[in-house]
Amino acid sequence: MDTKTEARIYLADQRGHSTLGSFQSFHSFNFGPYFDESRKPFGSLRLLNDDSLKAGAEFSLTVEEPTDILLLPVVGGLEYKTLQTNDFVEAGEVQVLSLDAGMSYEVRNPYRVELINFIQIWLSRNQPNLSDQRWAFNLGQKNTLFTIFSSDDNIGFIGKFDGRHDDYYPIMNPENGVFVFVVSGVFEVQNRLLHARDGLALTNIASSTIEFEALSNDAILLLIEVTL
């Protein structure tokens, strides 16, 4: 049993929740009017929202500090817009928007009928990169962690795994923390049981390695290593 690693579980049914018209969001960390002392940002990971947007609906947000924003479609695709660009990103891709303090972006559901679901992640950085990125991955290739984001400070991965497949992630910097989010299915991560949309924050990681096992077929795991 790993007794060195410090861990905090973020249960799906204990997340913050907000609904505004056609927009619904579940917050793993404090966001908007939702505040809980135990849900402060995890190092440079400021926000991880599980968002749904009805057909034709849109919303906009503004960042208060230099921020890398990851838009990860889970169901359907989405349109996004900043002062510099306007484009579409679909499932199997991640769009990274690098914004300076005070900059805004918009997200829109372009479909006439279908609801979309996506994960929205904010990562703070000392200086804005101001260079948007697009990352693609193929979850049809199972039992592999695909890089979905990489900077000098943070790195993210996603993968789909067969049931009972076990694996590990060697962290890049032992001073960093790792946040794990289960997109679908069930996993055991560092001997902690996680269900769909649960999160797990890990620090002081034993042996500088994250061990995990998928406990259901086609389980999808999101893993982000961040500066603390």
Model-derived regions, located:
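Hydrophobic transmembrane alpha-helices and immediately adjacent juxtamembrane helices
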Residues: 1-10
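Conserved short histidine dyad/triad with adjacent acidic residue
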Residues: 9-37, 44-65, 74-102, 154-174, ...
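Structural motif
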Residues: 77, 184-186, 218
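Conserved, well-structured core segments that form or line functional sites
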Residues: 113-189, 196
